[in-house]
Swiss-Prot record:
Stretches that traverse the bilayer: none
Main function: Probably part of an ABC transporter complex. Responsible for energy coupling to the transport system.
InterPro entries for the chain: AAA+_ATPase (IPR003593), ABC_transporter-like_ATP-bd (IPR003439), ABC_transporter-like_CS (IPR017871), ABC_transpr_CbiO/EcfA_su (IPR015856), ECF_ABC_transporter_ATP-bd (IPR050095), P-loop_NTPase (IPR027417)
Recorded GO MF terms: ATP binding; ATP hydrolysis activity; ATPase-coupled transmembrane transporter activity
Chain ranges of the ABC transporter domain: 2-241, 267-491
Protein name as it appears in the record: Putative ABC transporter ATP-binding protein TDE_0906
EC number(s) given by UniProt: 7.-.-.-
Family membership: Belongs to the ABC transporter superfamily.
Binding positions (ATP 1): G36, K37, S38, G39, C40, G41, K42, T43
Organism lineage: Bacteria, Pseudomonadati, Spirochaetota, Spirochaetia, Spirochaetales
Length: 491
């Protein structure tokens, strides 16, 4: 169904080959997973298969690529999309309307499908993904995970026999990942061909027929299904990759030491309320105390209000009622950005420079010893070799590391990280863990909005569960048992 023979690709605006000498065959009905460190060429391979390289992302391609027996270079994009549908890493990049319902039916309308058939598909896909509560919502109101679901649903509306997915689980809560697993199993049982680019492998371990590892633009290892069940997490971690078993204990996963006990509060939230629409509250009386040294994992289902709470903490949103105190004194929204930093879920919103280096220099021109600090953080996050590249040419994982690096230079008393590891391999995740630990220290605090179980165990010393607009659990991370229970039963 998908055949690549000695395929190489180089973008026009970069000197190095993005992928080189890729030979790969995916048979009809197979589910093949491609993984590898951030920036290894996975997304470029994805773009070559769906025709966006070189038609949209300009560059030079060599070798041959066929899709369903047809030479890809001779096909129009519209012909390719009739065979293969794509779920992109950033779901917002494939939205064409402003509301959920319109966006779901748009692909079918664009292909001239009859109204009755569109309605039948809409009913089937909505039921499959449990989207009924979202149908009348605006896309701008959705959480990152909800947007991810809509992107997946719009692709399923096309009912193509080949489905390509780039990091489909990156913004999803645990139950939504379980649902995605069931959907992929259904598609596979019906003979769909699935090619999935992914860092988080645990939900695919039982489904995939082959796991392919890329490194520096090339395929370096391939694991057959029978072999995967015999491999522990440590072997993958040694390669800088995520493990296959989410809740398996391993030698590299450590519970972060608890912060030293102190009665001095850094930030206090009392009875915080907020809603985007009249008579619909997202936050319903939030009470939270944040202490120096806290590295808080803010967890909860998609759409529960985690990002909204994060934006209130840093002043991007103003609470509709309630009190926020800093060091026991009133802390109005208009001045919070001076003390609180924010790393957004969509990192493209925070990239402004013409190069990686310029992006870190921006706003830090007066920073003492700025050159040494910039080079140090570039080295810590393995970005030194990329410092002259334009930020838009980076992979999603590299972009995430860049905005985390910028937050390190700002050195705010409180930093909110919104899904900082969604595009990161295991090695990069550990580097980010170390940097957040350095940012927090003993005097600052960090709040990390995340669904990443491995990351929480490696980084956080406290977890807060947001549920039904209120904080329902708040506990120190002394071990993984309580966190594992919450992931399995309440996320």
């Amino acid at each position: 169904m998908i055949n690549l023979n000695d395929v190489s690709y180089k973008y026009n605006d970069t000197a190095a080959q993005a992928i080189q000498h890729i030979s790969l065959s995916v048979k009809k009905g197979e589910l093949v997973v491609i993984t590898g460190k951030s920036g290894c060429g996975k997304t470029t391979l994805f773009r070559c298969v769906n025709g966006l390289c070189p038609r949209f992302y300009e560059g030079e391609i060599t070798g041959s690529l066929t899709l369903n027996g047809k030479v890809l270079s001779s096909m129009r994009i519209c012909d390719i999309s009739n065979i293969a549908a794509s779920v992109f890493q950033n779901p917002e990049s494939q939205f064409f309307t402003t509301d959920v319902l319109s966006d779901l039916v748009y692909p079918c309308e664009n292909c001239g499908i009859e109204k009755e058939e569109i309605q039948e598909r809409l009913h089937r896909v909505t039921k499959l993904l449990s989207l009924e509560p979202l149908l009348n919502r605006k896309l701008s109101e959705l959480s990152g995970g909800e947007k991810q679901k809509i992107a997946i649903a719009s692709v399923l509306m096309l009912d193509t026999r080949v489905v390509l997915m780039d990091e489909p689980s990156s913004n999803l809560d645990y139950q939504s990942v379980e649902l995605l697993t069931q959907i992929l199993a259904q598609l596979k049982s019906k003979g769909y061909t699935l090619l999935i680019i992914e860092h988080r492998l645990h939900y695919l371990a039982e489904l995939c027929d082959r796991l392919i590892v890329m490194e520096n633009g090339s395929i370096v290892r391939e694991y057959e299904k029978d072999l995967l069940c015999t491999i522990g997490n440590d072997e993958f971690h040694k390669q800088g990759l995520r493990g296959l078993h989410l809740f398996q204990n391993n030698s590299n996963t450590l519970i972060t030491p608890q912060r030293q006990h102190t009665d001095k509060r850094l930030l206090t939230l009392h009875d915080i309320h907020f809603g985007y629409r009249k008579n619909t509250e997202v936050l319903k009386g939030i009470h939270l105390s944040i202490y120096p040294g806290d590295k808080i994992a803010l967890i909860g289902k998609n759409g529960c209000g985690k990002t909204t709470l994060g934006k209130i903490l840093c002043g991007l949103k103003k609470e509709q009622s309630g009190t926020v105190l800093l060091d026991g004194r009133s802390f109005p929204a208009r001045v919070r950005s001076k003390t609180a930093g924010y790393v957004m879920q969509n990192v493209d919103f925070q990239l402004f420079g013409c190069s990686v280096y310029d992006d870190l220099l921006l706003g830090n021109e007066a920073l003492p010893d700025k050159e040494n600090r910039i080079q140090t953080v570039l080295e810590k996050l393995s970005l030194s070799a990329l410092q002259e590249q334009h930020p838009t040419t980076l992979s999603m994982g590299q972009k995430q590391r860049l905005v985390v690096a910028a937050s390190f230079l700002q050195n705010k008393r409180l930093t909110i990280f919104d899904e900082p590891t969604s595009g990161l391999d295991y090695g990069s995740m550990q580097n980010v863990c170390a940097l957040i630990d350095s940012i927090t220290g003993k005097t600052n605090a960090s709040v990390i909005i995340t669904h990443d179980y491995e990351f929480i165990l490696n980084t956080c010393n406290r977890a807060v569960l947001l549920e039904d607009g209120q904080i329902k659990e708040d506990f120190q991370l002394n071990g993984s048992m309580q966190l594992e229970y919450i992931f399995k039963e309440r996320l």
